[in-house]
């Protein structure tokens, strides 16, 4: 079953799904802007197109991730994103 999500007045949209091969995940697109997300479960985020500048809890500073690159966000935390151009991502929810 697909679950459609919309955040930040439509600037971020995603489709959640369950996959036999990767488990619970979502794929989405973010318009240019700055965003703060909170997590319930640990997350593995992979950039598909564009780039994401990310501030992860416990990190020493902002890091840029480009297509094919992955970052991890701990459970029960917040992380900040700066998006310079429309960008897409795959988010896997880890257990």
UniProtKB/Swiss-Prot annotation:
Its EC number is 2.4.2.1, 2.4.2.2. It catalyses: a purine D-ribonucleoside + phosphate = a purine nucleobase + alpha-D-ribose 1-phosphate; adenosine + phosphate = alpha-D-ribose 1-phosphate + adenine; cytidine + phosphate = cytosine + alpha-D-ribose 1-phosphate; guanosine + phosphate = alpha-D-ribose 1-phosphate + guanine. Keywords: Glycosyltransferase, Transferase. InterPro entries: Ppnp, RmlC-like_jellyroll, RmlC_Cupin_sf. GO terms for cellular component: cytosol. Pfam families: Ppnp. One of its GO terms (molecular function) is purine-nucleoside phosphorylase activity. Transmembrane segments: none annotated. Belongs to the nucleoside phosphorylase PpnP family. Catalyzes the phosphorolysis of diverse nucleosides, yielding D-ribose 1-phosphate and the respective free bases. Can use uridine, adenosine, guanosine, cytidine, thymidine, inosine and xanthosine as substrates. Also catalyzes the reverse reactions. This is Pyrimidine/purine nucleoside phosphorylase. It comes from Yersinia enterocolitica serotype O:8 / biotype 1B (strain NCTC 13174 / 8081).
